[in-house]
Amino acid sequence: MRQFPSIRGNINEKMMTTMVESQTRSPWRTPVPYLFGGLAAMLGLIAFALLLLACSYWRLSRQTEDEEKQTESGEKVVAKAFEEKILVIMAGQNNPTFLATPVAAKICLDCVNMEKKEGQNGESKVTEENH
């Protein structure tokens, strides 16, 4: 009869080499460290945003307390007036055709007062009254 070579010897050698390879394998080949690293970075970013919100709220509440103390002590609080800046760009064919800025409307209380009064038939009449 014919004799076959020993299979057990080859299997043991292969198992030993795979065990050695798995032990020397880099842990960064799996996605788990990247997953936890990304999760930690996201939680850090959220914590930083919450810290910024808490600090801004604290600063805002401190400013309102200072204003309340000034009004209680009788000091005159000067309101800060900021000019609203609005810019409107009207579209053109190639370039904007013009720029527009808002103009404050001047209302005169002594001017002519226009009032609508309904007539008997439901028609509206415009009357002018001078004050």
From Swiss-Prot:
Tissue specificity note: Expressed in the vascular tissues. Also detected in guard cells.
Family, per entry: Belongs to the GLUTAMINE DUMPER 1 (TC 9.B.60) family.
Domain notes from UniProt: The VIMAG motif is necessary for the function of the protein.
PANTHER family registered for this protein in UniProt: PROTEIN GLUTAMINE DUMPER 4-RELATED, PROTEIN GLUTAMINE DUMPER 5
Keywords: Amino-acid transport, Membrane, Transmembrane, Transmembrane helix, Transport
Assigned GO CC terms: membrane
Extracellular-facing ranges: 1-34
TM annotation in the entry: 35-55
Summary of the function given for this chain in its UniProt record: Probable subunit of an amino acid transporter involved in the regulation of the amino acid metabolism. Stimulates amino acid export by activating nonselective amino acid facilitators.
InterPro entries referenced in this protein's UniProt entry, alphabetically: GDU (IPR040359)
Places the protein is found: Membrane
Protein name in the entry: Protein GLUTAMINE DUMPER 5
Topological category with respect to the lipid bilayer: Single-pass membrane protein
GO biological process: amino acid transport; regulation of amino acid export
Keyword Membrane attributed: yes
Domain of life per record: Eukaryota
Extra remark: Overexpression of GLUTAMINE DUMPER 5 leads to free amino acid levels accumulation and plant size decrease.
Motif VIMAG positions after renumbering to this chain: 88-92
Side of membrane Cytoplasmic, spans: 56-131
Provenance organism: Arabidopsis thaliana (Mouse-ear cress)
